[in-house]
From Swiss-Prot:
HAMAP family: Rel_fac_3. This is Peptide chain release factor 3. It is found in: Cytoplasm. Belongs to the TRAFAC class translation factor GTPase superfamily. Classic translation factor GTPase family. PrfC subfamily. Pfam families: EF-G_D2, GTP_EFTU, RF3_C. Residues 11-279 form the tr-type G domain.
Length: 528
């Protein structure tokens, strides 16, 4: 099996995710990115539930009903000379750990900001996660066809709130009904706005040079205003610096309107030109480089029942190095077994195709009958494990109860499977038979009840429970941990992976426990 093409194939790949606050236009951007990459003939604009046309990237039943992205979809499309892997993340009001984990599987991120609102809470939270790995960030200021905030104010806010330098690449001319287009600072050209709706990409009129009299004819008084503004912008903002971008210290900023199919291509050009090709990763045996010939990858997400007809579960595996070939043998590090994979999948949001080959940077789907977990490492050469993917302590908790007590076994099976997939976390207290469900976002609770009913035929409901937070318990001295387990049993539980967890009714209770047991470590994250 010749792997001579590995370096060439790896260098043309770009793997990124989109991060944004709900309703900043992330799903629309996803559609338009696919449209410009020719993956969609008709980009499905997300409207209310009555519209029969659903966005390509929102494909689970619940998403179709609500018009929101609940699960992470993976889409691959060609653009320019590159092959782009886009990982779509839950973007609605309540998201889940899936979003965090997806950010560990990409090499760069596109941050979408609603130019009328600026930096919002969810964006701040997601940026914190990208900082764990200093991920390079490209920024798209969206919705310029509506009335927006002053562009300079927006850049100032990104710099001060998110602590990252901004380098404007395009600059808007007007806004709302008076939106005329953008000036591209690096190309010294003005691209005039003509709206394209749905799947039509309008021919763009481009005027070269800022002093070109054609510009005055085309946009009137806005031309002189633009020249004055650009003098100010060039003096007050940062120039694009590729090294700072790769280090996650500076973000190139593009302006446009995804709904109007305008500006998305400029941002995509920046992505393929500047974003890093697939990067290597640390393992317990040192670093693996993407262009190494031997295959390796890790599982960052498990999706149950992607196809209701098949009742299956798919493990999403990010290839870190080398090449996957149909029928190849891999070593699954956690269980120490060799497995032969002949039916890996590639995706366009729910449309699955069997895969002949894939390279570092690609995301492949592995059929999972319960033997694969989040964080699992697969290798074809040396045996090693990638540094784990974090589990984040839930922020919300409820007790789950059955309407039919005879279904306890099915309930536990469903909850354990959904927790392995990352839909929620489940905790079983040591002292009683309660089942506590923990989540990062409120909607996860609804998702779990709906899926328990639809996929496991279990009718469940929630009750309030007095829990403020959870912490995973570690200790170097096993005797001390055993002693702690006896003394604090009333507050202890096992999570879905049988890890000891402290369930705190209040933050004060947690502080007191930490003071009382200084030799015990209370962790907010746990590696898979």
């Amino acid at each position: 099996m010749s792997n001579a093409l590995v370096p060439q194939e790896v260098s043309r790949r770009r793997t990124f995710a989109i991060i944004s606050h709900p309703d900043a236009g992330k799903t629309t951007i996803t559609e338009k990115v696919l449209l410009f990459g020719n993956a969609l003939q008709r980009a499905g604009t997300v409207k209310g539930k009555k519209s029969g046309q659903h966005a390509k990237s929102d494909w689970m039943e619940m998403e179709k009903e609500r018009g929101i992205s609940v699960t992470t979809s993976v889409m691959q499309f060609p653009y320019s000379d590159c092959l782009v892997n886009l990982l779509d993340t839950p973007g609605h009001e309540d998201f889940s750990e899936d979003t965090y984990r997806t950010l560990t599987a990409v090499d760069s991120c596109l941050m979408v900001i609603d130019a009328a609102k600026g930096v919002e809470a969810r964006t701040i939270k997601l940026m914190e996660v990208t900082r764990l790995r200093d991920t390079p960030i490209i920024t798209f200021m969206n919705k310029l066809d509506r009335d927006t905030r002053d562009p300079i104010d927006l850049l100032d806010e990104v710099e001060s709130v998110l602590n990252i330098k901004c380098a404007p690449i395009t600059w808007p001319i007007g806004m709302g009904k008076e939106f005329k287009g953008v000036y591209h600072l690096l190309r010294d050209e003005t691209i005039l706005y003509s709206t394209g709706q749905g799947h039509t990409i309008q021919e763009k009129r481009v005027i070269k040079g800022l002093d070109n009299p054609e510009l005055d004819t085309a946009i009137g008084d806005y031309a002189e205003e633009l020249r004055d503004m650009l003098d100010l912008v060039k003096g007050a903002s940062h120039e694009f610096n590729h090294e700072e971008f790769i280090a996650g210290e500076l973000t190139p900023v593009f302006f446009g309107t995804a709904m109007g199919n305008f500006g998305v291509d400029h941002m995509l050009d920046g992505l393929v030109d500047w974003a890093p090709s697939p990067q290597g990763r640390e393992t317990d045996q040192g670093k693996v480089e993407a262009k190494d010939e031997k295959f390796s990858g890790f599982v960052f997400k498990i999706q149950a029942n992607m196809d209701p007809k098949h009742r299956d579960r798919i493990a999403f595996c990010r290839i870190v190095s080398g090449k996957y070939q149909k029928g190849m043998k891999m070593h699954q590090s956690r269980i120490g077994k060799d497995v032969r994979i002949s039916d890996a999948l590639t995706f366009l949001a729910g449309d699955r195709e069997l895969l002949e080959e894939a390279y570092a940077g690609d995301i492949i789907g592995l059929h999972n009958h319960g033997s694969i977990q989040i964080g699992d490492t697969f290798t074809s050469g040396d045996k090693f494990r990638f540094a784990g993917i974090p589990n984040f302590a839930p922020e919300l908790f409820k007790r789950i109860r059955l309407r039919d007590p005879l279904k306890q076994k099915q309930l536990l099976k469903g909850l354990i499977q959904l927790s392995e997939e990352g839909a929620v976390q489940v905790f079983r207290p040591l002292q009683n038979n309660d089942l506590i469900v923990g989540a990062v976002g409120v909607l996860q609770f609804d998702v779990v009840v709906a899926r328990l009913k639809g996929e496991y035929n279990v009718d469940a409901m929630y009750e309030h429970i007095n829990v403020a937070t959870a912490r995973w318990i570690y200790g170097k001295d096993e005797r001390k941990v055993d002693e702690f387990r006896r003394k604090a049993e009333a507050n202890l539980a096992l999570d879905g992976g049988d890890n000891l967890t402290y369930i705190a009714p209040t933050m004060v209770n947690l502080s007191l426990a930490q003071e009382r047991y200084p030799e015990i470590e209370f962790h907010q994250t746990r590696e898979h």
